Regions:
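C-terminal accessory/connector segments of nucleic-acid motor ATPases
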Residues: 323-592, 599-604, 610-611
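Helicase motor core with emphasis on the C-terminal RecA-like subdomain
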Residues: 2-8, 14-23, 30-404, 411
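Intrinsic-disorder/low-complexity peptide segments enriched for small residues
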Residues: 26-29, 609
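Secondary-structure transition/turn motif
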Residues: 4, 611-612
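Short leucine-rich amphipathic alpha-helices used at interfaces
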Residues: 8-9, 427
């Protein structure tokens, strides 16, 4: 199902219709948290388990799921190999399993994650539980791989176990008729971007691959009178949340961002998505461009190119797969950075500051990110660029002091403290993880008011408060090994590098279509295994072809006109049959004669014509 196609409904509605807990497996912690908050806001019991919450909280969530107090349980794929989770799972009444971003299980996909291969172990534990795999971007090869890796057909519901059971593959069309796809080659991308933003009214997203460039580009646009801000994974979580809300609420027109922005963003009226740099694959481009026009109204997806893009694209392929010796060096530096010795570190989840790491060990962030991805695919670690860590609170006054008038507590402060004490029992002894959305609902506060109230209590030295934040983390999935023994398999490096090149070639093909090329919608649909019966008629290729055809027709019409005028230029009457000797069709000649008569350039007497 394409981006914005309503994937959540496909499992939420059927799961609500039956008893039991629905387990949703997703790699996107930020999206996981947003989904949980949305469900809770409408009164549906939902929880998420990830590395940003305490062990005690995880145990509490799992116990609640066992006793029926949780309807939707969101977990990361790494959680499926956790002993505590598997032990508790045995006692749950699981009614449904949903695999989101299912393309991550396929090595043919653009975002392969080895942890997804563990999902099949869950199927062996719960063989009769229905399983739904969802993705917005899957080629036919990826779809085939998903059905094989998840062994659809081998695990049939008990009531039809005696019959052959085949997987049902449902696919919505990838065609987005309301989106006009455009590739534009220009000398100055900044100038062209500003021109496009002024010509298309409404909200826009501008994607660029460089964090520094987001800030520079946003500043340039603001100087030109355009209302913009910027967003990337390196920003403080509070700033990211604020800017996201400003953009969604219409206070900001243009969001300049890296691809860290967009997952889980549900804004229907985005009129324009512009890419300043070419994405790595058509899957990525289609997903990001598809954030435009979810309301069905006319929208635009524009890719800006210049003469240097092909060279930089080729260089990017090399950067995505740095030499194995470099990957080993990054691994060593990570272990030094976290003070992890040989044969230790398994299971450790540690906060990772990319900028500090790169400065300390003289690396470039893009190279480190590529190395981390390879180490993750080789199953040495898990890198989460945005790990959602819940807010934490500890009361630092004695219980009897809470009623002391000297504290001058406001109504909101008193109400919030009472609510906290009602639901959390460790506030006086530990920094306790709290659920912001749940408490806001109980206190009838907005999130901003809730945050302001806790900050006020912190300033009065009543509590210690650490706001919710999204921080990068690295989890070591095995003990540290000597880098000489670090193995990066062929399937992780050479094979994936080859598939990366193949996807890049398709993206270059998309960029390269000219007036004689393939309709962009047709090319995209063909890539995803879908046939378009006729060209879209709206992309820049189709429009250029239509203009060229019109110009050609006008040119040909002028040639016929000149040939007729030359024949009649002697001023003598000519029989109409002589015109056939000019070599043009009867329709073209008839149309030309009618034009000349309308212009009063010739007269006709029966079958004879004379130039006036």
């Amino acid at each position: 199902m394409p981006t914005g196609g309503g994937k959540s409904i496909t499992f939420q509605v059927p799961a609500l219709a039956v008893k039991g807990v629905c387990i949703i497996i997703t790699p996107l912690i930020a999206l996981m948290q947003d989904q949980v908050e949305h469900l809770k806001a409408i009164g549906i019991q939902a929880e998420a388990i990830h590395s940003g919450i305490s062990r005690n909280k995880i145990i509490s969530i799992l116990d609640n799921a066992i006793f029926g107090a949780v309807k939707f349980l969101y977990v990361s794929p790494e959680r499926l190999s956790n002993e505590l989770f598997l032990a508790k799972l045995a006692y749950m009444n699981v009614c449904f399993i949903t695999v989101d971003e299912a393309h991550c299980i396929s090595q043919w996909g653009y975002d392969f994650r080895p942890s997804y291969l563990k999902i099949n172990e869950l199927r062996s534990i719960l063989p009769s539980v229905p399983l739904l795999a969802l993705t917005a971007t899957a080629t036919p090869a990826v779809v085939k791989d998903i059905t094989e890796k998840l062994e659809f057909g081998k695990h049939s519901p008990a009531d039809i176990a005696t019959t052959e059971y085949r997987p049902h593959v449902y696919s919505m069309s990838f065609l987005r008729r309301n989106i006009t796809y455009v590739v534009r080659y220009v000398e100055d991308k900044y100038v062209e971007l500003a021109r496009i933003l002024r010509s298309v009214e409404g909200t826009a997203i501008v994607y660029t691959r460089n964090r520094k460039k987001t800030k520079e580009l946003s500043r340039e646009l603001n100087q030109q009178g355009l209302n913009s801000t910027y967003y990337h994974a390196g920003l403080d979580s509070a700033i990211k949340t604020q800017r996201q809300h400003q953009w969604q609420d219409g206070e900001i027109d243009v969001m300049v961002a890296t691809n860290a922005f967009g997952m889980g963003i549900d804004k229907a009226d985005v009129r324009l998505v512009v890419h300043m740099d070419c994405p790595d694959s058509l899957e990525e481009y289609y997903q990001e461009a598809g954030r435009a026009g979810r309301d069905g109204e006319l929208s635009y997806a524009v890719l800006l190119c210049d003469n240097s893009d092909r060279t930089s694209f080729s260089r990017r392929i090399a950067n995505a797969f740095p030499p194995k010796d470099y990957v080993r060096r990054v691994y060593d530096h990570l272990c030094f950075y976290f003070y992890i010795g040989i044969d230790s570190g398994y299971g450790a989840t540690l906060e990772f500051d990319m900028d500090t790491f790169c400065i300390k060990y003289h690396h470039f962030p893009t190279s480190v990110e590529s190395a981390l991805k390879l180490l993750q695919n080789a199953e040495y670690l898990v890198y989460q660029p945005e790990n959602d860590e819940a807010a934490r609170v500890k009361i630092i006054v004695a219980p009897y002091q809470l009623d002391d008038p000297i504290l001058h507590l406001t109504h909101n402060e008193s109400m919030l403290l009472e609510t906290l004490l009602r639901y959390y029992g460790t506030l006086f002894s530990d920094m306790t993880y709290i659920e912001t959305s749940f408490l806001c609902n109980k206190c009838s506060m907005t999130e901003d008011t809730f945050h302001f109230t806790l900050k006020s209590l912190s300033q009065k030295r009543v509590v210690n408060y650490v706001p919710r934040r999204r921080v990068p983390t690295i989890t070591f999935t095995r003990d540290r090994v000597d880098s000489d023994r670090l193995n990066i398999p062929r399937a992780v490096y050479e094979d994936m590098q080859q598939r990366y090149r193949e996807r890049a070639d398709k993206m270059l093909e998309y960029m390269s279509q000219g007036v004689d090329g393939v309709c962009r919608q047709r090319l995209i649909l063909d890539y995803f295994g879908e046939q378009l019966q006729e060209d879209c008629g709206t992309c820049d290729v189709c429009r250029a072809r239509r203009i060229a055809a019109r110009d050609s027709k006008e040119t040909k019409s002028e040639k016929v006109r000149q040939a007729v005028l030359t024949l009649l230029s002697d001023g003598k009457p000519h029989h109409v049959s002589e015109l056939k000797l000019l070599g043009y069709s009867s329709e073209q000649l008839a149309a030309t004669l009618q034009e000349l008569r309308d212009d009063e350039r010739l007269s006709m007497d029966g079958s004879e014509i004379t130039l006036i």
